[in-house]
Amino acid sequence: MVIALSHLGYEKNSTLNYYDRGIVMNTRHIDMIIGGHSHTFLNYADYVTNLDGDKVPVVQTGSKGICLGYAKIKISKEGRLSFNYKLIPVKSHLDSKLDMAFSDMIDAYSATVSAKMDEVIGTCPSAIRKGSPESPLGNLTADALIWMAKEYYDVDADVSLYNTGGIRAEISAGDLTIGDVYAVYPFDNVLSIATMKGRDLKTLFDYVASSGGMPVNAGVRLVISGDKVKSVTVNGRQIEDNKDYKIATIDYLMNLGRYGLQNATSRNDSPDIIRDCFVDYFRHLAAENGGKITAAKDGRITKNQ
């Protein structure tokens, strides 16, 4: 039996090449897909036909722990599957009926984790906000990727790019802890360094413009008019179509296989989770600036109406 655990989304959308229903339609031998990403509440399994003409159940339980999914699968002696699925609402009034032995076990781990998460990296004199087309936190994030490429791989990246949706929280004024950094960058992405031709880099900036702006490094100057690129320079120069440029980004964007990134070469992915790399970067900033961590907008992205 093959059960696929997916975080692609239930139905096709504008940003993903693949999605749960489409995976079934274009494959064989998957017996069930348990999906995520789109936060779809499926009260009943959606049976989608695969390439062999078999009906494959696709299920998803919504979001925020509101429901549990229950699936009962039976395999006959002949190898045939029968399937029963339902959503079970999680009832908050049962919270008082905790298994104390289990709770005590969790508490022991929580104390260890909390001690690590509460470790102070530095101090932020003021809040560091996110937003589009440009923001202090977006700039800090993109510049961090440039630093990582140099620090870990001795690569002088020309461009860095981070997805706006990957920045999930803002940084408050005061002490910055490891837990705060994990809240800003909660996903298990990794640093990805690659080489792109200038023509593909232009395509990538078209995507940035159509998205209303995304975190890019200080070497970029991008002017957006409406949702189009009006002008863009890298390190003070126009982009040359046949020139090679080094880009530092994350595997999530690389794996989309779009916006010119699909043509990138010499890709190298870090073995380290990106949020731990951000912890290193913030430690570096604090060490260089008397314990302080700051960020600001500097005009790297301008949007004209």
Residue ranges and their predicted role:
Residues M1-I3, D31-M32, P57, V159:
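Short, Asp-centered acidic motifs that coordinate Mg2+ and/or phosphate
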Residues M1-N13:
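Short acidic, glycine-rich surface-loop motifs adjacent to enzyme active sites
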Residues I3, I33, H37, I73, ...:
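Divalent metal-coordination and catalytic microenvironments
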Residues S6, T27, H37, G62, ...:
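Sec/Tat-exported extracytoplasmic proteins
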Residues H7-L8, H37-H39, T164-G166, Y252:
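Short, ordered loop/turn segments at secondary-structure junctions
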Residues S14-K116, G213-V216, V223-S225:
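Active-site-adjacent helix-turn-beta-strand microarchitecture at beta-sheet edges
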Residues V48-V56, C67, N139-Q305:
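Feature captures C-terminal
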Residues L87-L176:
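Hard-cation-handling environments
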